[in-house]
Design a protein with these regions (language model features):
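Short, surface-exposed linear segments at secondary-structure transitions and domain or protein termini
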Residues: 26-30, 48-57
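Short, mixed-charge low-complexity intrinsically disordered segments
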Residues: 15-16, 20, 60-72
Length: 72
């Protein structure tokens, strides 16, 4: 899979990761993780769902940055 979007933020010993990757013949693999735990993981075949997920990721990343999280 090749990454379309990837962002990892850290605060102290905590880590949050967001990723969208192209999944050949399936569509896109979307995942959100907190430390080692999977918060959400989905496969999408519709790019519009991926776009909505990217908007949500960007809102969440902005909120985390306001809370003091920084790029890893």
């Amino acid at each position: 899979m090749s990454a379309v979007f990837t962002k990892t933020l850290v605060r102290a010993s905590q880590r949050r990761s967001f990723e969208v990757a192209a999944a050949p013949s399936v569509g896109w693999h979307v995942s959100e993780r907190s430390d080692r735990d999977v918060i959400r993981e989905q496969l999408f075949s519709d790019w519009h769902r991926v776009e909505r997920t990217l908007l949500r990721f960007n809102r969440e990343i902005s909120e985390l940055r306001r809370q003091g999280w920084i790029d890893a």
